[in-house]
A protein has these predicted regions:
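Glycine-rich, charged/polar anion/phosphate-binding loops
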Residues: 245-247, 271-272
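Short Pro/Gly-enriched beta-strand edge/turn motifs at strand-loop
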Residues: 242-244, 312
Length: 379
């Protein structure tokens, strides 16, 4: 009621002693969070931020960070950026050319349905691109049914090459691959991971490009990237160059590593999940644990708790994006053996439930109560 507003008196020092001097509503919960963690987190931020704000900074200050991690003990507070490394991934600038969808996924079915219409809409604008072969069939859908997936990919690639990258819509994916075309990441050599795979072998590899559905805990990525020697050479040679279709290769040292990831666009709650050994793109924020006192399953539980979503919205960033530099500012409590055991068991159970289908709401309730009360002490 704006005619009878609440008046809350708060000393200016509260905001000056808060991380980033953020202005927050002085509710009972927020003031309790401030009392327990406000000055501690600000001191950590002031000391460490310039040393962890980029993956390059983390590498530059590697020895100091290792010594700091070794000094941590249960109950200590540390910024997530001091406990992990990682960052944004690859921006191909031409996903249609490089990215395919696994044939057994719902995304593949969507592509099978949309391809004829995409082709028809383009040819209506560019009738000179219609071939004699296409005219033999009653519809473009029937025409496409006569082609193999490799032939369809070649057709769409050639039309894009001739008429422009976005003729089917920016970022439209039209390639479908079988699982047998995807390489076993564990069998790849270091050279193949770094420089690409010969096309005489399966040369697609798993590709994590974010998750619009917002899955927590686990999701087997439905996408794969053509990691051929030719493609990798182009991506690396042209990274950062100006012009349409020029890629940006970020943080390649983290490619093919297991870790944690989330989409940078979220709704109300953060949704973190296990990242399999894959290439990750610019929309898939990824971090990798480097402190055995704070393992990834524990971090996974903390980020997936409702409290951390609330903390981010109140004290770090209240927009609809949660990027890597937001994550690096998260306060993480170094767990006791008992807390670590609880979170490890819960994370494994949640992942197992996710593999079977949906996760019961009781799992989230159990997690929220534990993180808020037992870990952060907000009773």
């Amino acid at each position: 009621d704006l005619s009878l507003p609440d008046h809350l008196t708060v000393p200016q020092s509260v905001y000056l002693n808060t991380q980033n001097s953020v202005i927050f509503k002085p509710s009972a919960l927020n003031m309790r969070i401030y009392e327990l963690y406000g000055e501690k987190v600000k001191a950590l931020y002031d000391k460490w931020w310039d040393k962890i704000k980029t993956s390059r900074d983390i590498e530059k200050n590697k020895r100091e960070l290792e010594e700091y991690r070794a000094s941590l003990k249960p109950g200590d507070v540390a910024l997530l950026g001091c406990l992990t490394e990682g960052g944004q991934g690859l921006a191909t600038a031409n996903n249609g050319k490089y990215i395919a969808v696994r044939s057994t996924t719902k995304w593949a079915n969507n592509i099978r349905i949309s391809r004829p219409k995409k082709l028809a809409d383009f040819l209506a604008r560019k009738p000179e691109a219609i071939t004699v072969e296409m005219r033999r069939y009653s519809s473009y859908a029937v025409f496409l049914q006569t082609l193999s997936e490799a032939e369809i990919a070649e057709l769409f690639d050639s039309l894009k090459e001739q008429y422009g990258r976005d003729i089917f819509g920016q970022g439209y994916l039209y390639k479908i691959v079988e699982d047998c075309e995807i390489a076993d990441v564990d069998s790849l050599t270091d050279d193949e991971k770094e420089n690409g795979i010969e096309t005489t072998k399966p040369y697609y590899v798993p590709y994590d490009k974010g998750d619009k559905d917002g899955n927590r805990w686990y999701l087997e990525t439905p996408f794969a990237i053509a990691w051929s020697k030719e493609n990798v050479r182009f991506l690396k040679t042209n990274s950062g160059k100006k012009g349409e279709g020029m890629p940006v290769v970020r943080n390649p040292q983290f490619y093919f590593r297991e870790g944690l990831c989330w989409s940078d666009i979220n709704t109300t709650f953060l949704k973190c999940r296990i990242k399999q050994k894959s290439i990750h793109d610019v929309k898939s924020m990824s971090v990798f644990g480097v402190c055995n006192k704070v393992p990834e399953n524990y971090i996974l539980c903390v980020i997936n708790s409702t409290l951390i979503s609330y903390y981010v919205d109140t004290f770090i960033n209240n927009t609809q994006t949660f990027q890597i530099n937001d994550a690096r500012q998260l306060p993480i409590i170094v767990p006791t053996v008992e807390q670590l055991s609880f979170c490890d068991t819960l994370a494994k159970d949640a992942i197992a439930q996710k593999l079977k289908g949906e996760i019961p709401q009781s799992v989230q309730e159990k997690l929220d109560d534990f993180i808020k009360c037992q870990v952060f002490g907000l009773v």
